[in-house]
Amino acid sequence: MAYPFQLGLQDATSPIMEELTNFHDHTLMIVFLISSLVLYIISLMLTTKLTHTSTMDAQEVETIWTILPAAILVLIALPSLRILYMMDEINNPVLTVKTMGHQWYWSYEYTDYEDLCFDSYMIPTNELKPGDLRLLEVDNRVVLPMELPIRMLISSEDVLHSWAVPSLGLKTDAIPGRLNQATVTSNRPGLFYGQCSEICGANHSFMPIVLEMVPLKHFENWSASMV
């Protein structure tokens, strides 16, 4: 999860988030190189007296500044398209969880189980225990098995919401009348926090998401106790 004065991204917990972090670094390096080149050219223009005010055209320069931006765009587009494909591809999920957004809470349904569903509300500040996180704790966590592909079906009962867990690289809009899907795969156990990321009304900031990733055996015991 995020911590005060954090400058970088949250620690990656899923393969998708690892790819997104690498792509961020890749793109940032390209932006840094372009910015350095532009600043260098500007500094030369300001400090040198060797200018060509009478030059009408320069085929070599025009060729370079046409081909170079195109090549840079390709270097950005190819890994981006690859990650977009990975985010949309779901291969043999072991579990499907349906998530519905409401004003202002989330409800979850494990479609592979009978009668395994619950609502998840934020715990008010005056009911928090020592060590709990303000505006992030919920009364019912979403318990999922780690290291396995899980399909999340996401929609809304009323207005636009967005189901987002940054450390897993997840952000999927919850749209009334439409069913969107996302893949969840965690590399390690733990608690992972998110929030509604679409302005949805007065209590928009009071819709936290808590995923509890556990080993498969623990998940089976939990699901058996809930059914």
Swiss-Prot record:
Localization in the cell: Mitochondrion inner membrane
Disulfide bond sites: none
Co-factor note (free text): Binds a dinuclear copper A center per subunit.
One of the GO biological process terms: ATP synthesis coupled electron transport
PROSITE patterns the record matches: COX2, COX2_CUA, COX2_TM
Topology feature Mitochondrial matrix, residues: 46-59
Broadest EC class assigned to this enzyme: translocase
Positions with a binding annotation for Cu cation A1: 161, 196, 200, 207
Residue spans crossing the bilayer: 15-45, 60-87
Positions on the Mitochondrial intermembrane side per record topology: 1-14, 88-227
GO annotation, cellular component aspect: mitochondrial inner membrane; respiratory chain complex IV
Keywords: Copper, Electron transport, Magnesium, Membrane, Metal-binding, Mitochondrion, Mitochondrion inner membrane, Respiratory chain, Translocase, Transmembrane, Transmembrane helix, Transport
Name of one Pfam family that matches: COX2
InterPro entries tied to this protein: CcO_II (IPR045187), CcO_II-like_C (IPR002429), CcO_II_C (IPR034210), Copper_CuA (IPR001505), Cupredoxin (IPR008972), Cyt_c_oxidase_su2 (IPR014222), Cyt_c_oxidase_su2_TM_dom (IPR011759), Cyt_c_oxidase_su2_TM_sf (IPR036257)
EC number: 7.1.1.9
Cofactor(s) required, per the database record: Cu cation
Topological relation to the membrane, as annotated: Multi-pass membrane protein
Binding positions (Mg(2+)): 198
Residues reported to bind Cu cation A2: 196, 198, 200, 204
Annotated catalysed reactions: 4 Fe(II)-[cytochrome c] + O2 + 8 H(+)(in) = 4 Fe(III)-[cytochrome c] + 2 H2O + 4 H(+)(out)
Gene3D superfamilies documented for this protein: 1.10.287.90, Cupredoxins - blue copper proteins
Molecular-function GO terms, alphabetical: copper ion binding; cytochrome-c oxidase activity
Similarity comment: family membership: Belongs to the cytochrome c oxidase subunit 2 family.
Role description: Component of the cytochrome c oxidase, the last enzyme in the mitochondrial electron transport chain which drives oxidative phosphorylation. The respiratory chain contains 3 multisubunit complexes succinate dehydrogenase (complex II, CII), ubiquinol-cytochrome c oxidoreductase (cytochrome b-c1 complex, complex III, CIII) and cytochrome c oxidase (complex IV, CIV), that cooperate to transfer electrons derived from NADH and succinate to molecular oxygen, creating an electrochemical gradient over the inner membrane that drives transmembrane transport and the ATP synthase.
Subunit composition and interactions: Component of the cytochrome c oxidase (complex IV, CIV), a multisubunit enzyme composed of 14 subunits. The complex is composed of a catalytic core of 3 subunits MT-CO1, MT-CO2 and MT-CO3, encoded in the mitochondrial DNA, and 11 supernumerary subunits COX4I, COX5A, COX5B, COX6A, COX6B, COX6C, COX7A, COX7B, COX7C, COX8 and NDUFA4, which are encoded in the nuclear genome.
Protein name: Cytochrome c oxidase subunit 2
Organism of provenance: Uromys caudimaculatus (Giant white-tailed rat)
Lineage: Eukaryota, Metazoa, Chordata, Craniata, Vertebrata
